[in-house]
Swiss-Prot record:
Glycosylation, residue list: 74, 97, 147, 208, 223, 234, 254, 302, 355, 378, 395, 469, 502, 520, 546, 603, 620, 631
UniProt keyword Glycoprotein present: yes
Signal peptide: 1-56
UniProt KW Signal keyword: yes
Keyword list, A-Z: Glycoprotein, Host cell membrane, Host membrane, Membrane, Signal, Virion
The protein's name in its UniProt record: 120 kDa Glycoprotein O
GO cellular component: host cell plasma membrane; membrane; virion component
Residue ranges with Low complexity bias: 275-292
Similarity comment text for this entry: Belongs to the herpesviridae U47 family.
Region (Disordered): 275-303
Pfam families: Herpes_U47
Amino acid sequence: MHLEVIVQSYKKSKYYFSHTFYLYKFIVVNSPDMLHISRLGLFLGLFAIVMHSVNLIKYTSDPLEAFKTVNRHNWSDEQREHFYDLRNLYTSFCQTNLSLDCFTQILTNVFSWDIRDSQCKSAVSLSPLQNLPRTEIKIVLSSTTANKSIIASSFSLFYLLFATLSTYTADPPCVELLPFKILGAQLFDIKLTEESLRMAMSKFSNSNLTRSLTSFTSKNFFNYTSFVYFLLYNTTSCVPSNDQYFKQSPKPINVTTSFGRAIVNFDSILTTTPSSTSASLTSPHIPSTNIPTPAPPPVTKNSTKLHTDTIKVTPNTPTITTQTTESIKKIVKRSDFPRPMYTPTDIPTLTIRLNATIKTEQNTENPKSPPKPTNFENTTIRIPKTLESATATTNATQKIESTTFTTIGIKEINGNTYSSPKNSIYLKSKSQQSTTKFTDAEHTTPILKFTTWQNTVRTYMSHNTEVQNMTDKFQRTTLKSSNELPTIQTLSVTPKQKLPSNVTAKTEVHITNNALPSSNSSYSITEVTKEVKHTRMSASTHEQINHTEIAQITPILNAHTSEKSTTPQRSFTAETFLTTSSKPNIITWSNLLTTTPKEPLTNTSLRWTDHITTQLTTSNRTQSAKLTKANISSQTTNIYPQTITGRSTEV
């Protein structure tokens, strides 16, 4: 009689899980001569099982074994949901349809990457993936015990899904069905456009997959540009010479892609950095600055290797880096991908060195009477053409015109790191008629361009210098009695430095009108900051600035409303008039009480604030077209009693 004993055991890798099946056959023959052999075989078999269970026997297996041996139809609802979410995501934005088996293999490759395995597996080196922040999804396999699962990084998942062409485990027929467009080099047939990529990212962030995400992070921020060039590196060959080329090459490396010209530092990618599970992800990934350029000519379909001689080295190009700060951590509320910095209701407490705002203009035929918006969150500013004259003063007799606009501030958090509500900013090119919106999921290059703009502004405006006390330049006008409307109050501002003739800028202040302790009051927070129109300029005495970028962009203003009101309503305006001349200019504001307060407003003040603010109405006024940086002081006016105090503030 023959007895076959089949023992199945599972391998638990340290960093990923797959199934390895060992078949132990012990042939027991009904013969006394073979009894001692069968006993010895049984003993050795049991010994092997015990040693395997305590993970003392080392072995290797194909990462695909997990899905090759597990019937996906036996998965739990959650596993199946994850799988089909990812498959639908792929098939929705790729023109080549994949079979379930082929996509299963792709997905398995994504899940199975051992990012801590530094050994070369065919043409793929996985150690650089260690630098990616670890936001992971854990899917438990139904055919195993509870602690058997597959782990996938949500940050590398989507990109790896579209980069499986470099894996050695995929079958050739499956690889041929995976045409990817990576770095503008058409290795295969797929047409993955920027728009489809952005939509895929958005769909990915809103899918059910995010419900199982848990946050991890590493010391280095995730960089999509760096990651895809890591893939480029891996499609060459896994030989020491290539390793040395990238590790020892001058940094950064300037490469042309279908998304523009980008800078990547391979040395930082190839440096292993341990992950940390103690902090949440803290900042949107900021790729190197891209300048739009035509896509490079396509590579033939059979060209599966990209050689290093196609990469141009530019050692003198500055590298922009970011750091995690505690203040940024306070902003992030979610770990979804792409993750927003904060919601409009989350006003973070930050150390702000500079408040800057980007403005967008709407081109309408009648600039004097723009439609009054109903949703202030997405409203854009328009400045009537009548504001372009040199007159810089207003008075109470002028007609009040409803010119509604709102502002969103992009706040400098730490060094050259900026944040903005909803993680979106607007840029407008001189050569374009329309305004283009960029979000974090689509592109973060404008933030770096904005940083370059800040360096330019810093060059000419010296906003880091100490603020001068200009309280003596107030034209102090106070309220006469509680039964009268407030008169116009003015503040004289002297520009600090005259700008070059080819640079125009506007600096405005935002003032908070608080009525305390009265409950029958309202206030709106108004923030008006600087607007810069760039032309090509020299920065020879300062840090290197990319002139092409400066010439291509004009910072513009986005919109957000922050207003609290009760009765009686009291509208509030604040505006500045700063020209390139050295003469003082006037800031005016007015308090218009619609009704007489029932009780004295003992602590009504006009003061500086750092919050995201909104100005809802402006008076019909004229304004200089050329404006510049200046030091200003804010004024506090108490209605009852009539006292005036001054406070110096830097804009």
